[in-house]
Curated annotation (Swiss-Prot):
A Pfam family: Bowman-Birk_leg
GO CC annotation: extracellular region
SUPFAM superfamilies: Bowman-Birk inhibitor, BBI
GO molecular function, one term: serine-type endopeptidase inhibitor activity
Reactive bond for chymotrypsin, annotated site positions: Y66, S67
Top-level lineage group: Eukaryota
UniProt KW keywords: Disulfide bond, Protease inhibitor, Serine protease inhibitor, Signal
Cleaved propeptide residues: 11-24, 88-96
Keyword NADP: no
The protein's name in its UniProt record: Seed trypsin/chymotrypsin inhibitor IVA
InterPro entries on file: Bowman-Birk_prot_inh, Prot_inh_BBI
N-terminal signal peptide: 1-10
Chain segments annotated as coiled-coil in the UniProt record: none
Length: 96
């Protein structure tokens, strides 16, 4: 009679894909958006429609496509737009 056992070295990898997609509690000030859609209502309802490999740091509802690289979009709505991600003075805000 013999007994065989496998030992698996499991560890938490903080740089894994899922931890990049989920909000990690970063400061909202670090969140950014290049393309923001807002309604004409007062106050406006705005949503970032950027598609990137990860959502911005303050995103609560991030949806990613199963692709390589992943294509993620944040579905949170706010009464404002985040600052532009890239160092350009042109921030695209589209009012519906």
């Amino acid at each position: 009679l013999s007994f065989a056992a496998n030992v698996v070295n499991a560890r938490f990898d903080s740089t894994s894909f899922i931890t990049q997609v989920l909000s990690n509690g970063d400061d909202v000030k670090s969140a950014c958006c290049d393309t923001c859609l807002c309604t004409k209502s007062n106050p406006p309802t705005c949503r970032c429609v950027d598609v990137r490999e990860t959502c911005h740091s303050a995103c609560d509802s991030c949806i990613c496509a199963y692709s390589n690289p992943p294509k993620c979009q944040c579905f949170d709505t706010h009464k404002f737009c985040y600052k532009a991600c890239h160092n350009s003075e042109v921030e695209e805000v589209i009012k519906n």
